[in-house]
Curated annotation (Swiss-Prot):
It comes from Arabidopsis thaliana. The lineage of its organism: Eukaryota, Viridiplantae, Streptophyta, Embryophyta, Tracheophyta. Pfam families: SLAC1. Homotrimer. Interacts with SRK2E, CPK6, CPK21, CPK23 and PP2CA. The channel is inactivated upon PP2CA and ABI1 binding. Interacts with KAT1, KAT2, KAT3/KC1 and AKT2. Interacts with GHR1. Residues 1-189, 238-265, 317-325, 374-388, 440, 501-556 are cytoplasmic. Keywords: Abscisic acid signaling pathway, Cell membrane, Coiled coil, Ion transport, Membrane, Phosphoprotein, Transmembrane, Transmembrane helix, Transport. This is Guard cell S-type anion channel SLAC1. The chain crosses the membrane at residues 190-210, 217-237, 266-286, 296-316, 326-346, 353-373, 389-409, 419-439, 441-463, 480-500. Signal peptide: none annotated. Preferentially expressed in guard cells. Also detected in the vascular strands close to the leaf margins. Disruption phenotype: Constitutively higher stomatal conductance with over-accumulation of the osmoregulatory anions in guard cell. Impaired slow (S-type) anion channel currents that are activated by cytosolic calcium ions and abscisic acid (ABA) (normally leading to a decrease in stomatal conductance). Higher sensitivity to ozone. Increased water loss associated with a constitutive stomatal opening phenotype. Reduced circadian leaf turgor changes. Changing residue 146 to F: In slac1-8; impaired ozone-triggered rapid transient decrease (RTD) in stomatal conductance. The record marks 450 as: Important for channel gating. The keyword Transport applies.
Amino acid sequence: MERKQSNAHSTFADINEVEDEAEQELQQQENNNNKRFSGNRGPNRGKQRPFRGFSRQVSLETGFSVLNRESRERDDKKSLPRSGRSFGGFESGGIINGGDGRKTDFSMFRTKSTLSKQKSLLPSIIRERDIENSLRTEDGETKDDSINENVSAGRYFAALRGPELDEVKDNEDILLPKEEQWPFLLRFPIGCFGICLGLSSQAVLWLALAKSPATNFLHITPLINLVVWLFSLVVLVSVSFTYILKCIFYFEAVKREYFHPVRVNFFFAPWVVCMFLAISVPPMFSPNRKYLHPAIWCVFMGPYFFLELKIYGQWLSGGKRRLCKVANPSSHLSVVGNFVGAILASKVGWDEVAKFLWAVGFAHYLVVFVTLYQRLPTSEALPKELHPVYSMFIAAPSAASIAWNTIYGQFDGCSRTCFFIALFLYISLVARINFFTGFKFSVAWWSYTFPMTTASVATIKYAEAVPGYPSRALALTLSFISTAMVCVLFVSTLLHAFVWQTLFPNDLAIAITKRKLTREKKPFKRAYDLKRWTKQALAKKISAEKDFEAEEESHH
C-alpha cells in the first residue's frame, strides 16, 4: 500500500529498529535494574521486559503521549508503603517472604550477645543467610546497612516529623511491621522518665510550700511532701527497672534512642530526678542534718557530668550533630541539670563546685536559647505551631534563679533577672488558649510539667524576698497551675494505660532504615531515547514551518 506524502505543516519522526549491539546494551541495562529493584522470588523474576521497536512513522503527538505515559508510570514507583514489608523479598523483622505465616522476628533489635546465641542454632543461621542474600544487590552492596550501625542525625530529620520526631513520614519505610504489636520493652521509650521528672519536681514544690515563710499562712502539712516523695521514688524505681530490662534485651533499640536528636536529651532525666529527690527529701528523714552527704552528689551528678561532656563536645566540635543541626526545646534537659546539680552541691556544702556548675549551665543555656530563638534553617525539630514542648524554655532560667539564691543565700539582681526571663516566657506561653489542644498525648508530656513546677518554686523564693500580696498571689497561682497540670496528666496516663490501652504504641521512630530505600534509577545512555527524538522532531517541525513561511514570502 502506498504511503501518502505529508505537507509542510505535518512533521513525522522516522523511528527505525535499534541495531543489535545497541539493543543488547539496552536489554542488559534493563535486566540489571530489574534485578536490583524487583522483590519477587519466583520463576518470573528473571523475565525481561519485551523490547519495543518501531518500524513505522508516528506523529509527534503520539511521541508526546507515550512520553507522558512512561513518566506517570515512573512517578508511581517512587513511593514506598509505610508497612515494613516493602523490602525486595524481605518481610518485616527479618523474615523471608515465604508465605508460611511465620511471626515477625524482632531479634534485629536485641543485644549482640543474645543475637549471637540465636545464631548458634541452625535454623537461625539459615534465616540470617537468606536475609543477607535478599538484601544484597547485584554489585555486592546492600540496600540497607546493618541494624547495628548508627543512624545519622540527618536521617532522623529526613525520615521523621513532629516536634518530638516520633512520627514516620508517609514516603518512608520501617524495619518492623506497623500493624503488628511489638514487644512491650520495644514500645517502652526513654521518655517515660518524664513521668518521674513531673512527680519529683512536685515533691520539691510541696516541700517549699510547707517550709516557706511566704506561704506559712496556708498551714500546709509536710505529709503531702512525704506522700509525693515516696510515690515519686516508687515510680522512678519501676521505670528504671523496666528500662534496664530494655537495655539488657534490646540494647540496639536503646542505641537508636541515644542517637535520636530529641530522645538523647532524656538520658539526662534519670539523674535530674535523683537530684530532685535528694533536694526534696522529707524533713522527718533528716531532721537535724544541715548538709547532705557528698557521696549523694557524686553518685547522681557524676553520670550527668560525663554525659554532658559527650553532648557538649558534639555541639562544640561541629559535624553532623552540631548544635545548630540538632537543637530542639528538649535540649534544655541537658542544661537544666547543671543548675539542679549546683543546688545539690550547695546542699552538701560544696559552694565552689556549685558556682562552677552554675557558670557552665548558664553559658550553655544562652547558646541553646539563642539557637532556638533564631529558628535557623538547620533547626528542623522546632515546630511552627504551639506545642507543650515550648514549656522547656522556662525550665533553665527558673532553675538558674533558684540555684543562685541557694548558693549566695539571697534573691539578688542576678537571681531576679533569671526569674523575670522565666516569668516572661511563662506568660507568653500561657497567653495562648490552645496550648494543650490538638496534639496526640504522649508520656513525654510529663517532662514538660517540671518547668512549670520549677517556675512555681522560683516564684515562692521571689515572694520571700519581696513580700506582699501580689507576689504571694503569683506564687499560689503558678503552684496551682503546675499541680493541676500534673493531676490532669496523671488521670490521662491512667486512662491511656488501663482503659484505652494506648499509652505505649509501636515506637516507629526507632525502626527507621539507615538510609532511604526508595532509589531512583541512574540515567544511562540509550540507543533509542524517546525524549530525545521527540525534542528533535519538535525542532524539525519549527524549522520546517519557518522555511515554509519564508518560501511563501519569497513567492509573493
